[in-house]
Amino acid sequence: MLFRLPIVKFFNRILSRITVTVVLVALQLAWLAWVFFALTTGTARVWVTGVLNGLSLLIVLYLVRKDENSAYKVGWIALIGLLPLLGGALYLAFGNKRPSRRLRSKMQAVEQAHRTDRAQQPGQTAGLCDENRGVSRYLTQYGCYPAWQNTTARYFSCGEAMYPALLADLEKAEKSIFLEFFIVSQGKMWQGVEDILRRKAAQGVDVRLIYDDFGSLLGLPKDFVVRMERAHIRCIPFNPVVPLLSLVMNHRDHRKIVVIDGKVAYTGGINLADEYINAITRFGYWKDAGLRIEGAAVWNFTVTFLDFWNAFRPFEQDYSAFRPQLAVLPDSDGVVQPYADSPLDEEPVAETVYLDILAQSQQYVYFYTPYLAIGEEMLDALRNAAKRGVDVRLVLPGIPDKKLVFRLSRSYYLPLLRAGVRIYEYTPGFLHAKCCVSDDRAAVVGSINMDYRSMFLHFECGVLLLQNSQVLALRDDVRRTLPQCREVQCADCRTGLAGTVLDSVLRLLSPLM
């Protein structure tokens, strides 16, 4: 008995999903290397080399004509030029935005069938100033996410502030609970949520969970779905990792959404894992942000969740059962416009919203982002805003979770600083919030990082707040956070020749990161 527990832990560890995945990927790489070096000799190796180089050339030609973000294309073309033998294969594994036909057709069919559920109701944007009207119209017309009044919002400046409110709202659920997260990990935070979900499911509440299979790979046991389904909690592990078929899969579900009875919704950067509420310490203090909305605007997230769900487990033909008839609507507090972004179309919703806010800013614009890997268009928008006198500030982590990505983020500092952008690093720990606020009139709280993967490859979500009181709450949070940060100066960006070369290489590899 003394040795039983360590032995069980050892076998559980070596049989965990992440261990199996790493081993299978390593075996795949070893097999490919063996095929190339052992089986391809002489003429055969010349043919294989020619095929790989030809593949890289075809992908470069494909990228040149593709309607895609120019910086993203140039990054991949440069990488393929640097590694012509492997560049094409790397693009297919890591960079290809084109989803499987099956995934695209499923999502498009569901979204088209429920397009009328996203219709803009008249009079909802009345009273918006000129600077706000354009971005709201864009989200309505090109994102199909209507704007709403009669919605209250509450901003949370950290996970431990949001968590009790989330639990309290889950306890009040009477009809449905929908959850969609990138990371679900066993621990205190998930246990508190799971206990309520189990009770509510036993009471007949419709409980559903979508989680990203890759994001949750480390945190969940192999039998998680079976356990949840036995408790009448329906689950979809999105885009399951199949290591023998691909080295990595794009199109991760990076969204964070909770919808309760169609009346209350949550979003932000906070996943269901202990570090997000600082129940455990990882990379110092974990600074995040969340948003609770209640009222008419919740409908956008309800439809977003149901569209995603029905693409994989078709269930509802009519969403109206999930649209509550609110006897008393909340007083209007500006406009609230929840939205989502998808890699399945060619519309870069997340990036366009940020670009519009920057273009319309006159006094200030602040960003929270854990990562910075941006294209020329976003880089120019930040610099141009600063050059015309706007107070542009970026807040990033002081303690990184990924050191190479942090180094990549810092490689963008100098051109921004020289244009007048002010950059801060959050010294108490890791800043994971993804927010933007401008001119006391517009803000975004959501799951969207300022990097290639969020802007172009992942499923993301956010809430646009226009002339809403929580715009000021986010502004005040940023201003309270700045004294806890170290402001970066141009002198801090001197890296020497070796550092400059490393930064250049990381820029080339940025589409992979």
Identify the role of each PLM range.
Residues 361, 371-393, 397, 402:
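Helical hairpin unit composed of two closely spaced alpha helices linked by a short loop
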Residues 1-352, 356, 360, 400, ...:
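N-terminal localization/anchoring segments of enzymes in phospholipid and broader phosphate metabolism
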Residues 353-357, 377-391, 408-411, 417:
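Exposed, interaction-prone extracellular/peripheral surfaces
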Residues 182, 370-371, 405:
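Glycine- and other small-residue-rich loops at beta-strand/loop junctions that grip anionic moieties
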Residues 434:
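Catalytic-core elements of nucleic-acid end-processing and repair enzymes
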Residues 423-427:
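Active-site donor-binding acidic/aromatic loop of nucleotide-activated sugar
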